């Protein structure tokens, strides 16, 4: 009878070098993940900074366009104005002809009576759409009655559309003034646009014409 001899060999214990190589691999992977996350975070911060800068620039362009519309309205009301479309005779003391509820059209474009006491102002009530540039719009585009021009367009760093304004005639409540001779007050509200029309700025002034 033959007997088979089995020799059992004990497993060799791992050497310190093997453990170190495994630890180094894990450490490298962790560092790689950390560096990747830092890179993604830096990219996002850079993108947000770029968007913030662009928004600030576009808002500034819209604000400057709105201020330009206020100045255009002042020329419309006070002059000097040599445009064939000028309407300086409308803005005389005591005259409210052409000013209507909801703002006028034609020669009276953008001329508005103030809202009733306790009601929302005309410029805030939603009855006036400053973004409407159609033929039925009730706001005045820059240069309409003054002949002045402003560069606009969808390309370049400039307003996409012309700024627009309305003019409300409002009572002067200054005590002691004669009702028949006191100066007329006009409240001008203007909206300007940035390189994208969705970027908007609204400014307002009250103008007293002596």
Positions of predicted regions on the chain:
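Terminal alpha-helical segments
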Residues: 2-11, 19-28, 32-33, 38-210
């Amino acid at each position: 009878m033959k007997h088979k001899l089995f020799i059992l060999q004990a497993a060799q214990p791992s050497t310190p070098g093997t453990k170190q190589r495994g630890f180094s691999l894990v450490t490298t992977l962790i560092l790689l993940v950390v560096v990747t996350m830092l890179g993604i975070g830096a990219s996002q911060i850079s993108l947000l900074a770029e968007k913030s800068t662009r928004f600030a620039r576009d808002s500034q362009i819209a604000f400057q366009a709105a201020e330009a519309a206020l100045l255009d309205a002042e020329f419309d009301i006070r002059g000097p104005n040599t445009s064939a479309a000028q309407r300086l005779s409308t803005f005389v003391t005591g005259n409210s002809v052409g000013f209507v509820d909801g703002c006028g059209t034609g020669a009276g474009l953008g001329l508005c009576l103030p809202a009733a006491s306790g009601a929302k102002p005309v410029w805030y009530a939603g009855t006036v759409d400053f973004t409407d540039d159609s033929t039925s719009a009730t706001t005045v585009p820059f240069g309409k009655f003054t002949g002045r021009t402003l560069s606009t367009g969808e390309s370049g760093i400039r307003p996409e559309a012309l700024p627009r304004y309305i003019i409300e005639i409002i009572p002067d409540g200054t005590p002691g003034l004669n009702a028949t001779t006191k100066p007329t007050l006009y409240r001008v509200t203007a909206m300007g646009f940035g390189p994208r029309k969705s970027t908007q700025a609204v400014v307002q002034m009250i103008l007293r014409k002596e």
